[in-house]
Amino acid sequence: MLSITQGIVRRSVARPGLIRPLVKCNARYYSDKPEDSLTWTDFFQLRKQERRINVGSSVFTALVGANVSWAYLSTMEIDPTQMIFGFDPLVVVTAGLMASGALGYLMGPAVGSQVFKLTKGNKLAQYNLKNKEFLKHVIQNRVDASSQSFSNPVPDYYGEKIGSVKEYRQWLRDCHAYAKKAKEFL
């Protein structure tokens, strides 16, 4: 009785091109370093895209929230002579519209992150790994904010404004300058 591997070897003797594609396939899938690893430049571009998607979705959900509340409030019967919570009805309606728009704006990043995950799903695992590594660098290199003052403000404590490798290096220089100033003046 022949095993599967012996059958493949015997067939490959008859057709020598059969084993070679299998080896190439396996080598590609089991290589140590992936061919399309995410560089820091690509990471910062994806980070900027995620931020833009989140802001855009915040504006969109704010408009949707305000329109939905307007659709509800425009059909309500309100007596203009009666006060609502001690306020004029027009003030209450306006506050309701603004509150629903603000709530929609706050819901935007939740929608935007899902859109980002759907559009960049193939790079998402690498992006998350780079993001964790980047945040570790930020936490490790950020300064102690307890000695800040008007003349010596803290340089971007959470690293939110860092958009490139050049800006990251500038942020590091700013952190070192802040620490030096804080040490000298204490």
UniProtKB/Swiss-Prot annotation:
Q: Where in the cell is it found?
A: Mitochondrion inner membrane
InterPro entries listed in its UniProt record: Pam17
Set out the biological process GO terms recorded for this chain's protein. Answer: protein import into mitochondrial matrix
Q: Which Pfam families match?
A: Pam17
Write out the transmembrane intervals.
53-73, 83-103
What is the protein's given name? Presequence translocated-associated motor subunit PAM17, mitochondrial
Provide the assembly information. Answer: Component of the PAM complex, at least composed of mtHsp70 (SSC1), MGE1, TIM44, PAM16, PAM17 and PAM18.
Which family does the UniProt entry place this protein in?
Belongs to the PAM17 family.
The task this protein performs is described as: Component of the PAM complex, a complex required for the translocation of transit peptide-containing proteins from the inner membrane into the mitochondrial matrix in an ATP-dependent manner.
Give the stretch annotated as transit peptide in the record, renumbered to this chain.
1-30
Its keywords, alphabetically, are: Membrane, Mitochondrion, Mitochondrion inner membrane, Protein transport, Transit peptide, Translocation, Transmembrane, Transmembrane helix, Transport
Tell me which species this is from: Candida glabrata (strain ATCC 2001 / BCRC 20586 / JCM 3761 / NBRC 0622 / NRRL Y-65 / CBS 138)
- Gene Ontology cellular component annotations, sorted alphabetically: PAM complex, Tim23 associated import motor
**How does it sit in the bilayer?**
Multi-pass membrane protein
